[in-house]
Amino acid sequence: MSKITSSGVRENVHKLLEYSTETKKRNFLETVELQVGLKNYDPQRDKRFSGTLKLPQVPRPNMTICIFGDAFDVDRAKSLGVDAMSVDDLKKLNKNKKLIKKLAKKYNAFIASEVLIKQIPRLLGPTLSKAGKFPTPVSHNDDLYSKVTDVKSTIKFQLKKVLCLAVAVGNVDMEEDVLVNQIMMAANFLVSLLKKNWQNVGSLVIKSTMGPSFRIY
């Protein structure tokens, strides 16, 4: 049973959007984040959960993606205007930790041709996995544009050592209804990952990049 109602969330979304679109409009597209504070959870002892959820709409349209591809996928990526790297490009990084870290920082997510996915750890070491950015596989039969959209629409909840986490659930250009729906979906999905569900939730807050926080739970 959800402890948040769409009317309660809507009220806060309304205030958040009003602030970002009228009170203090920024000259870039602000992301809306769901910030979660957990309680009665011990990251050392309890299971560190992780889960992914595909939202109906892309939270961050300007999210950057790079494709590690064979010749076929590198060509497809170029025709879509998406950055791509071939196996040779990856070999040129020569397992240099600094360069691989730089690559992991430069992009929000990665996609790799199915045929290459097994080679990624050998070529790049554990850096991408540690950053929570291990590539999503794509096959030649998949529509690459849809795959890119899927990756952009998917949010990831991952508990590390601290009891707070934040995920992008939308942006301030979205319709109120859409944003409310995305927040509700994300919050309820997160709660389903927790050992004691709502008893582990200390607080839920929504916030745009530069705006104030609004508590929804």
Swiss-Prot record:
PROSITE patterns assigned to the protein according to its UniProt record, in alphabetical order: RIBOSOMAL_L1
GO cellular component, one term: cytosolic large ribosomal subunit
Transmembrane segments annotated in the record for this chain: none
Keyword flag Transmembrane helix: no
InterPro entries: eL8/uL1-like, Ribosomal_uL1, Ribosomal_uL1-like, Ribosomal_uL1/biogenesis, Ribosomal_uL1_3-a/b-sand, Ribosomal_uL1_CS
Keywords: Cytoplasm, Ribonucleoprotein, Ribosomal protein
Keyword Cytoplasm: yes
GO annotation (BP), single: translation
Subunit structure and binding partners: Component of the large ribosomal subunit (LSU). Mature ribosomes consist of a small (40S) and a large (60S) subunit. The 40S subunit contains about 32 different proteins and 1 molecule of RNA (18S). The 60S subunit contains 45 different proteins and 3 molecules of RNA (25S, 5.8S and 5S). uL1 forms part of the L1 stalk.
Family: Belongs to the universal ribosomal protein uL1 family.
Function text: Component of the ribosome, a large ribonucleoprotein complex responsible for the synthesis of proteins in the cell. The small ribosomal subunit (SSU) binds messenger RNAs (mRNAs) and translates the encoded message by selecting cognate aminoacyl-transfer RNA (tRNA) molecules. The large subunit (LSU) contains the ribosomal catalytic site termed the peptidyl transferase center (PTC), which catalyzes the formation of peptide bonds, thereby polymerizing the amino acids delivered by tRNAs into a polypeptide chain.
Full protein name: Large ribosomal subunit protein uL1
Organism of provenance: Candida albicans (strain SC5314 / ATCC MYA-2876)
Gene coding for it: RPL10A
